[in-house]
Amino acid sequence: MRFWRIYYRLGQFGKEMVHNKGGKMLNRQVYVSDNEFIICPIADEDRDNYVELHRQINGEHTLFLNEHCKDMMWKQVLEGEDKVFSVFEINGDYCGSLELQNPDSDTPEIGIDLFENKRNKGIAPKVVKLLAKRCYKDRKVDYFLIRRTEFISQAIYLDFPTKKC
């Protein structure tokens, strides 16, 4: 496993999101947003999208579809030590999730998973940077570790700036 050091400074935060999804209005606390994306702490209303995301990544054998442990897995996402965020386009379309592992360390790790139809569109570097800037504003860190888990992800992270922005 390889890690890249990525350095960031300040970000935006503190808005509330209201959007129409499937004819239903949702009010969500926004962790950070810009003119393209909205990042919110994951919530119960994200469960179906999150499960589908993991089905796309892991196939039908994902633990989120396993009758014996799906509720336990979801509880871990909501209440675990890692912070999980849902990523939306500004129009409210769900893109995927971001995970901040070891959030209290000086070197937190950021992971990202996107729906198949949202991959290879330049979303990952933008939302990872957006999340990192906001996290840095909350608490100064030495650097963020970006985990590369798939060959496809390599292109996403190799294009990342490795200097201070």
Regions found by a protein language model. Give the residues of each.
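Short amphipathic alpha-helical patches
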Residues: 73-78, 155-159
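Conserved GNAT-fold acetyl-CoA-binding loop/helix
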Residues: 55-76
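Amphipathic alpha-helical interaction segments
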Residues: 12-16, 58, 72, 82, ...
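A short helix-loop-beta-strand connector motif used in the catalytic cores of GNAT acetyltransferases and
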Residues: 75-87, 96
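Acyl-donor (CoA/ACP) binding surface of acyl/acetyltransferases
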Residues: 7-14, 18, 23-49, 53, ...
